Curated annotation (Swiss-Prot):
Gene Ontology CC entries for this record: cytoplasm
Biological source species: Citrobacter koseri (strain ATCC BAA-895 / CDC 4225-83 / SGSC4696)
One of the protein's GO biological processes: malate metabolic process
EC number per UniProt: 1.1.1.37
Function: Catalyzes the reversible oxidation of malate to oxaloacetate.
Pfam families cross-referenced by the UniProt entry: Ldh_1_C (PF02866), Ldh_1_N (PF00056)
UniProt-recorded name of the protein: Malate dehydrogenase
Organism lineage string: Bacteria, Pseudomonadati, Pseudomonadota, Gammaproteobacteria, Enterobacterales
């Protein structure tokens, strides 16, 4: 099993690479790529960790050597949010980066499962899909927007509020991966109930958690370590499913049946070919139903922006 991390010299990429080096199954290969010249050194640094995961780093304009034979590609390349920016301000820079890298994937490892971490995910996933489609290699069961950070944040905040172990809480989060498009389904957590005020406050905190980190870092960055952990959780789940493990379920942002929007984050059963089954989002509370209906215009606009970027 070979996993490639593109954008591996950045804050998310390094955290992700560290977690993959320590947690990928024995015998896996990990390849790191970034435009930054430090990348081969990041791989050498990680290679000293005693796990049976082979690692190699590549830098420069061409990601091809890192992508050859990859089963899973995780893309975290791009610029990070600064205070006062929202995820859409990132679009102008990151759209071109994602387009370029996905073109290289289409040529070098078109059958790989691809996880997009680079923000704004609502839009960058649409860009990736259109690029793969143009190349004639698009498989909607193998392209994912990694929204796992919304899930782990939800788990943490709910556990804090309710005095539970974070590992005992699993909150499904649907929709997209920015602002109002992030919808935690707090009504679906077994054995936990909330007041209306708690639901409103928690939902808002989960939606704005990225800004919480950006402000706390006082201009020094955005959520990199928690995002690295979230991306590792998703990547490792995908690897386990590809290797044949059963009942691996994660939420991610994928192309579905278009019931709500072309791309939508929902619980997915993962399998040997990527998405095995798009699971139902279940019964929503009145609050959740309203929030879902209220986000769709925003989500559809985000998606259209990505489609137009490739097809203009």
């Amino acid at each position: 099993m070979k996993v490639a991390v593109l954008g591996a010299a950045g804050g998310i990429g390094q955290a992700l690479a560290l977690l993959l080096k320590t947690q990928l199954p024995s015998g896996s290969e990990l390849s790191l790529y970034d435009i930054a010249p430090v990348t081969p050194g990041v791989a050498v640094d990680l290679s000293h960790i005693p796990t049976a995961v082979k690692i190699k780093g590549f830098s420069g304009e061409d990601a091809t050597p890192a992508l050859e034979g990859a089963d899973v590609v995780l893309i975290s390349a791009g610029v990070a949010r600064k205070p006062g920016m929202d995820r859409s301000d990132l679009f102008n820079v990151n759209a071109g980066i994602v387009k370029n890298l996905v073109q290289q994937i289409a040529t070098t490892c078109p059958k790989a499962c691809v996880g997009i971490i680079t923000n704004p995910v609502n839009t960058t996933v649409a860009i990736a899909a259109e690029v793969l489609k143009k190349a004639g290699v698009y498989d909607k069961n193998k392209l994912f927007g990694v929204t796992t950070l919304d899930i782990i944040r939800s788990n943490t905040f709910v556990a804090e509020l309710k005095g539970k172990l974070p590992t005992d809480v699993e909150v499904p989060v649907i929709g997209g991966h920015s602002g109002v498009t992030i919808l935690p389904l707090l009504s679906q957590i077994p054995g936990v109930s909330f007041t209306e005020q708690e639901v409103a406050d928690l939902t808002k905190r989960i939606q704005n958690a990225g800004t919480e980190v950006v402000e706390a870092k006082a201009g020094g960055g955005s959520a990199t370590l928690s995002m690295g952990q979230a991306a590792a959780r998703f990547g490792l789940s995908l690897v386990r499913a590809l290797q044949g493990e059963k009942d691996v379920v994660e939420c991610a942002y994928v192309e579905g049946d278009g019931q709500y929007a072309r791309f939508f984050s929902q619980p997915l059963l993962l399998g040997k070919n990527g998405v095995e089954e798009r699971k139902s989002i279940g019964k929503l509370s009145a609050f959740e139903q309203n929030a879902l209906e209220g986000m769709l215009d925003t989500l559809k606009k985000d998606i259209a922006l990505g489609e137009e970027f490739v097809n203009k």
